Amino acid sequence: MALHARHLPSSLGDQAPHLLILHGLLGSSDNWQTLGKRYAASHHVWMLDARNHGRSPHDPIHTYEAMAQDVVDFMDTQGIAKASLLGHSMGGKTVLLLSQLHPGRVDKLVIADIAPRAYIPHHGPIFDALLATDPASAPSRDAVQSLLSKALNGDPVLVPFLMKGLHRLKEGGFTWRFNVPVLHATLQDVVGHIELGLNTLPALFIRGSESDYVSDDDLDLLEDHFLHMDHHTIQGAGHWLHAQAPDEFFAVTADFLA
């Protein structure tokens, strides 16, 4: 599958290393543009839309094996032999699997607020809300947002985040850029377990103190698998730590990637 990507060339020129950024579930490359510009001071930055997200193609298959292969195929197409990878949530699990299957293609990896374990799905209300909207016949963005807000109790973070995925159709009406039916049907795969082996790549695991996605026990388990591992906790940040604490997130990750 040919993924859509946003490219920010480095000011350092051709000798700069490559950094690929992979977003989380229901996100897109758009979520990373501000931080991407900062990383471009030292790296050629590629912000990818995962399959069934953003401007990348839709497909009934949505597994980590498929997503990891999509990234490798993208690197092959762009002539990128090796790159550092930064993944948040679903993107982080994709990076974990890719580093297991293709370690020679990875320089360093940054995993943002996710562990390889299986999670109990908690996205039911989100997908119920998305499936209940009929964006194709909606008269305005405000109408769609009103429906989402009502279904999600006016969540001040989640509703604006989801609305970023709403796209106006030329023929009128709207559509979701993310593939709601397929992502809903494959949610068990998205929250599933990633099998880890011994990994010798430099790895940074960064989490938010207010998020329950990465526990101390998770970090202990990860240290059994990653021989060269660092970890950092951003105090006061939740699961969307890169948006809630962008300066600290950038400082810690940029130092690691240098």
Functional labels for PLM-detected ranges:
Residues 26-34:
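Serine-hydrolase catalytic-loop signature spanning alpha/beta hydrolases and amidase-signature enzymes
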